[in-house]
């Protein structure tokens, strides 16, 4: 029997504590290799959590992702639950009509999106009501009215304590 809950924040902290220098390797949407460590993933996930909280995202708010499998997506997997949000991954292969239905049905209020998938977002933008769109830009400029992920993360110190979540 564990004497503490196995929540996402706990798993993140444990990885950063016991394996801080273990390399985390992934691919960016442009297929280039990205390398970091568990300590770096933990810090950036906490920065994302702080940035989302600063935007007014709160416990139970749904944060959707429309992106490919890469390091920033991993940061969202940890950062969103860390601040008490609900991570909702969207399938980029769905039609715009189906994506709009899923976003609306789930009640997503924030969307994290790969810049290469902005054309997909454009096709459903008028069908969904999102408070914030945060772009995982890869050397491209972020459209007006949207937030650059790296700027959001860089504005935080990475000390977000996290939301105390109950396992049961």
Identify what each model region corresponds to.
Residues 3-25, 43:
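A short N-terminal helical cap/helix-turn-helix that marks the beginning
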Residues 11-13, 54-55, 82-151, 161-163:
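Structural core segment of the AMP-binding/adenylate-forming
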Residues 24-70, 74-78, 95-100, 148-151:
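Conserved AMP-binding/adenylate-forming core of the ANL superfamily
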Residues 14, 18, 44-51, 155, ...:
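Solvent-exposed, charged/polar functional surfaces in cytosolic regulatory/catalytic domains
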């Amino acid at each position: 029997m564990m004497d503490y809950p196995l929540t996402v924040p706990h798993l993140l902290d444990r990885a950063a504590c016991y394996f801080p220098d273990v390399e985390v390797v992934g691919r960016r949407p442009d297929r280039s290799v990205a390398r970091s460590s568990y300590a770096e993933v933990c810090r950036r996930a906490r920065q994302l959590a702080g940035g989302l909280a600063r935007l007014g995202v709160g416990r139970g708010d749904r944060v959707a992702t429309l992106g490919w499998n890469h390091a920033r997506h991993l940061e969202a997997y940890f950062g969103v639950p860390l601040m008490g949000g609900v991570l909702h991954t969207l399938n980029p292969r769905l039609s715009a009509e189906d994506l709009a239905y899923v976003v609306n049905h789930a009640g997503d209020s924030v969307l994290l999106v790969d810049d290469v998938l902005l054309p997909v977002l454009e096709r459903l933008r008028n069908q969904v009501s999102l408070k914030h769109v945060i772009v995982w830009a890869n050397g491209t400029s972020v459209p007006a009215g949207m937030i650059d992920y790296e700027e959001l993360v860089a504005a935080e110190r990475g000390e977000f304590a996290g939301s105390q979540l109950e396992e049961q």
